[in-house]
Amino acid sequence: MSMQDPIADMLTRIRNGQAANKVAISMPSSKLKVAIANVLAKEGYVESFRIIEDSKPELEITLKYFQNKPVVESIQRISRPGIRIYKRKDELPKVMGGLGIAIVSTSKGVMTDRAAREEGLGGEIICYVA
């Protein structure tokens, strides 16, 4: 059976992995998943990530905890395959009043809402992370 929304699956694996206090999680790899993992690592929401090259590449994400509590409080898919959500540069949302991030897919790659605002870019809102 094919997966309908691999990004939602990735976010669910992160959410479930942290709820179960897992050290690391793995999933099938794709360019978009690696770009999202890169943003999460740069912003400090996950410890690290790596790509395991096999017959089918796997993405392994090392989760991050602070005082035995998950760093990611909430992670929510916004733009879905059935309902794509696009925003112009002046419409980009501020998650939790600027405390969280929105991950945005722009013409210059996947970045946070802050980076997209600085670049003067809009794009597809992939998810909110707080």
Curated annotation (Swiss-Prot):
Record keywords: Ribonucleoprotein, Ribosomal protein, RNA-binding, rRNA-binding
Domain of life: Bacteria
A biological process from GO: translation
Pfam families: Ribosomal_S8 (PF00410)
Family membership noted in the UniProt record: Belongs to the universal ribosomal protein uS8 family.
Subunit structure: Part of the 30S ribosomal subunit. Contacts proteins S5 and S12.
NCBIfam families noted in UniProt: PRK00136.1
Name by which UniProt lists this protein: Small ribosomal subunit protein uS8
Organism: Haemophilus ducreyi (strain 35000HP / ATCC 700724)
